[in-house]
Amino acid sequence: FEPAAKEENIRLSDKQQKLAVRMAGQLTEIVNQYIDASAISFSIIAWPLPSIGDRFEAIMDETIKVNNLDNDLFRSIQQKMIDAIDGAEYMHITGMNGNRTDLKVALWQLQDPAKETVFENCCADVNIPVGEIFTSPVLAGTNGTLHVSSVYLNGLNYRNLSLRFEDGCVAEADCSNYEDREENQKYLRQNLLQNHETLPMGEFAIGTNTTAYAMARKFDITQLMPILIMEKTGPHFAIGDTCYSHSEDHKVYNTDGKEIVARENEKSRLRDTDPEQAYFNVHTDITIPYDEISAITACFADGRQVDIIREGKFCLEGTEALNEPLNI
């Protein structure tokens, strides 16, 4: 869906925008006051509806396949990626085929590599389907441009979406939905930034579900895919809160026994002293398709570089099996 810019469209005033942001924050605080997030869990899965069209049965068959991929296989492959990245200073992501992404994502520095890790190895235990690895970026030092030629977020299309980050926060946002740049800015402010002046990068992830990516391309349903699946179909970046929002003090571990220590950033660190500045009550995943990725590279302090993806394909030794569905 791509709304037309009309004078008759209902828009919040500046005062109302500030009230909406404040209300969302207070509502979240009330929920967390009565629900202990560390004491509960969930599992979520997505299926197509018959309204998807006359190929419903074929799409359902493919979705069943996607939702039942080998959990142990993906855990093993993703662990190889995490082991290769741990200890890096930052990730460097660049685009190709018209994608202008050139972004450095600063990573948490490990104090005890034998017991700690930066990325969570996310399989199909909570979010189904498998799989991704994700982390909470360090905001300071996270700089550059994130660009996607076309992406659907919360049902809305963004054409040529471009976000420029300075120290992990959105410093400039643009898109080409409308001829009038002012209308583009309003569209982004109201829908993407959700009335915030800026948002931090709360998550950097590498989605590994190439089978889901191939399904979306095969049936030309990328615009219809729920974010639960789409976030697994390529590297993605979430603007807003981290994945550990309001649960930063609850220790979590990968199956290898290492504690995932990158659970907070410079914003959420203010949760005890200035909670209104710590949380944004927004978490929007922006996925770059594999065919627009030139490289995702782990960069180390000693100058060493390790490619995870090169020219749209997984290239780290031990991850090659992920490329099989990409031969479409």
Whereabouts are the PLM-identified features?
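Short acidic-glycine loop/turn motifs at beta-strand connectors
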Residues: N97-N99, F165-C169, F300-D302
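Active-site bordering "gate/hinge" segments
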Residues: F1-G141, I308-I328
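Long, well-ordered mid-to-C-terminal structural blocks that present hydrophobic/aromatic surfaces
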Residues: V138-H196
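Flexible loop/turn segments at secondary-structure boundaries
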Residues: E2-E8, S51-G53, R100-L103, D112-P113, ...
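Extended hydrophobic packing segments that form well-structured cores
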Residues: D256-I328
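Active-site lining segments that contact anionic ligands and/or coordinate catalytic metals
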Residues: G141-N143, Y158-N160, D167-V170, L199-E203, ...
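Dual-mode signal for accessory low-complexity, basic/Gly-rich regions
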Residues: E172-E248, N281
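Glycine-anchored, exposed beta-strand/edge motif detector
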Residues: T233, I239, S247-Y253, E264-D272
